[in-house]
Amino acid sequence: MSALRAVQLILLTAGLRFAVCHSMFESHVVDQEYIVTFNGYYLNETRYNYISAALRSSGVNNWKILERKNAATQYPSDFDVLFVDEYYSLKALDALTGHPVIKKVTPQRLVQRYLNEHLNGTENKVLLHRRSLGQDIKLWQKLNKRYKTRHILRAVPSQITKVLKADVLWRLGITGKGVKVAIFDTGLSNSHPHFKRVSERTDWTGDGDLDDGLGHGTFVAGLIASHRECFGFAPDADLHIFRVFTNNQVSYTSWFLDAFNYAIMKKVHILNLSIGGPDFMDQPFVDKVWELTANGVIMISAIGNDGPLYGTLNNPADQMDVIGVGGISFDDHIAKFSSRGMTTWELPQGYGRLKPDIVSYGTDVHGSSVSGGCRTLSGTSVASPVVAGAVTLLTSGILAQGKVVNPASMKQALLASSQRLPGVNMFEQGHGKLDLLHAYKVLSSYIPQVSFSPSYVDLTECQYMWPYCTQPLYYTGIPVIVNVTVLNGLAVFGKVVDVPVWCPYSHDNGHYLDVTIRYSQTLWPWSGWMAIALSVSQTIPKDWSGNVAGHIELTIESANTNYTVNLPLRAAIIPPPPRIRRILWDQYHNLRYPPGYFPRDNLNVKNDPLDWNADHIHTNFKGLYQHLRSSGYYVEVLGEPYTCFNATNYGALLVIDPEEEFFSEEITKIKTDIANYNLSVIIFADWYNVSVMKKIKFFDENTKQWWMPVTGGSNIPALNDLLAPYGISLGSNVYYGEYEMGDRKVHYSSGTHITSFPNEGIVVAKTLKNQGEEILGGDKSGREVDVPILGLYKSSGYIVLYGDSNCLDNNHIEIDCYWMLDAIMEYISTGNLPHVFLEDNVKISNNNATHYLTERLEHNELHKYSKVIRKSDSGIVQLPIPLCVTIDLAKTIVLNISANSDNYKPQKLKTDPSYMEENEYVWLQSLAASSKVSNETLAIEGFFTGFFLPITTLAIVLSIVAIFVLWRYYCWRAKAKQGLIALGKKKTFGGIKKSFMYILNHNSRIQSARGYNL
């Protein structure tokens, strides 16, 4: 089954009456419809001939090219939408993919977004995030209960342009003139009074309506270019309105592809895309975004409204060539709804990239209402057009200077000029908050160059470099990976010259750090990547600890120029921790959407069907990771099979919610590690029931397409294979409920149960309800039964098994059970069973185990997404186990220098040597000719910087001096009065003189007694 794209229009509103919108999205493959992509642009007739020739030779007759009525029809295109009878579909696909001019064939997708609006008369402080999407108003009232008490009210600015000082650039004559901006949204009315330069409106939905029936497109356009009431940033920009969603909130992938092609034909400069979804593997969409930016279009996209959960970035904002925007409030706090990084494309073998790129205001922002006037909205789909409007303004100013702007140079300037928010990590804020004026100054002095994102790597810097700064490096540890984006402002295409070079600083013990570098050989469009694996050298002295430093040197050839750029790097090293304090996290056996339908772990959460947060310790298991670190444990991530780690280094292997199969070699390896090396294995599973999987499959009435899960919450049959050597197995029933263990309350959410366990082991049972029967329409009584859910077994090592992982997962967590993992770690560390596990012990009749054993779903499609199995003519077979990753050290040149403290700060871009900025007035004068700055503006600025500012400074200094003199006078006066009283003198000149002498002598005796030097 092909990857399904889930695209949502990220829309969160808090209007003048503070409307709260709940947004959901669904995406389905359209049955019997395929997008045929060609290797170039061809006219309609030519494309028809190519498809006809390919299908004619295969004997496929029942097919047709679907007509697309839109503004792009008159131009050549690089794709067609093809309908093929289901009977011939496999034949047709084979024939088409074999044609020399056909690049690929992918399913057509339908995207639907649902908005359910509730009006609330008071400001709603709880902003939309993934856990509450689609919930009813009762849940919102429950979430809002903490705001029933008094709290400080804050003023919300009425003009976002004033906050970001766009008016300063307006006074320079910079208003967006000459810049074409494409807005992909819900349309715009032609008669709306806020807009004066709507160059073109196009409808891509096929229903012939150009107006905005929802209001979102109007608001977005207003932030970019409104010229009255609630002002936009670039009122003179030329707006190109692309209506890509119907009023029923439906769209198709092909609509976007056509609209993107048209935007390229129209040579737009900037494109705002306030949509997104988790499917970064929808290749036609991703490819077309690359093509857009390769043609010089600066794309700004919302990062998503799925925060505060980590690993929730949306595509295309997570692409390297796109400016991904997160949201903040007006008090400069990260908005709760704003999606967090890291990217998850690179997992499990690699590590995610830094995203979002930048943040801006996205909470309670004023903008244009569909009916005229202004309203407020919140969401990253608001922050995105704020940045898009700012970029439009910047582009018009730079083009007026006769300079060139491209997607990379604009991104470099935004990142280098941003203001970092204190106490916020890089996966929340990116490079920081948008600074419009600083960005303009950077662009004004910009010269084409190559830069990094992040611009330096300091694994000792907390909080910004979280999670790297939370755990030092040590010998025998699994390499830590830092994934850096390379931005190429020289040209759309570049390539790496020679190889990157690691340059350790000898004065900072950089030679104790082993560095492995993998990188993209080519940079296209405008960007590439460099993955840095860091480990500790075996040459390091025993028990040595300290910081190490150096830099990585990379040379790029682009636009007939070789450009060398350095990435400063610093890390902390400690001696290896005790084995029992080291935990190995199994990432290799976690699978998620995309590409397949991997269902949710908690079946009670019906509005969130996909498991798409990567199940990583730095995404949806962030809370667990922080708890383990604060408890003194060191957590390492295994992105390879079990055959690739040394069990003698670790106290426990942690297997949480695995969906992948296990190699037979892995099962043998774990058995050996437990028996010979005392390794302990801790497993937290989830549900698996074939009937429930069939019950929760999707069926779309429009597309007539079934979407079947490829596994359950966990792959229980695979876990049973892993545990079979010990006589341990898990069952197919699904249970839920709430129970107590000791003085702790525990939520059990769609978990499995233990069906067999060694007699010498300990099994804990709790009273729960059968959720599987309820879902399947059986038991509606809510009857509770005793269910064995926790097993503890000791051989040479320990095996601990629990049936539900939701209490460790930040996604939909109700009450965490971190304490349970603490108790398990205490058990495997000391051998002493915590008292809390001695309650409700039961014995399991292993004779009945086979009755409850889970069976694999017949004809499931796990093999399409698995790294372990594949489908052959004889059935499902195991793939050869991959080789372990070897550490190939980077080319190294030791430098006899020390690190500069400025290296480990945001790196500045190189500037034009002719650009000499002495102060603001000189800077304005240098722009006067090209920016048409009026003499009045210069006079005002000159007066302020040349006369008013120094006078004001002098007045402040004199005021401070006067206050100090008065304070000293009153102090002496008080002491003089004390002296008169002590001497019994009157207020005469002689009396005052004697009183001062008395005070001086008295103070001198006291100070001498204290040893002061008088």
Stretches found by the model and what they are:
Residues 15-18, 49-52, 56-171, 320:
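Autoinhibitory propeptides
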Residues 25, 157, 168-201, 207-252, ...:
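Subtilisin-like serine protease catalytic core
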Residues 45-46, 50, 175-177, 227, ...:
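Substrate-binding/access-modulating region of protease and related hydrolase catalytic domains
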Residues 158, 268-272, 324, 358, ...:
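C-terminal subdomain of the subtilisin-like protease fold in secreted/lumenal serine endopeptidases
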Residues 189-201, 327-384:
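Catalytic-core environment of secreted peptidases
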Residues 221, 240, 244-245, 312-315, ...:
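Hydrolase catalytic cores
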Residues 448-468, 489-535:
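Surface-exposed binding patches on compact interaction domains or structured appendages
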Residues 558-1014:
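Short, surface-exposed patches at the edges or C-terminal ends of soluble domains, predominantly
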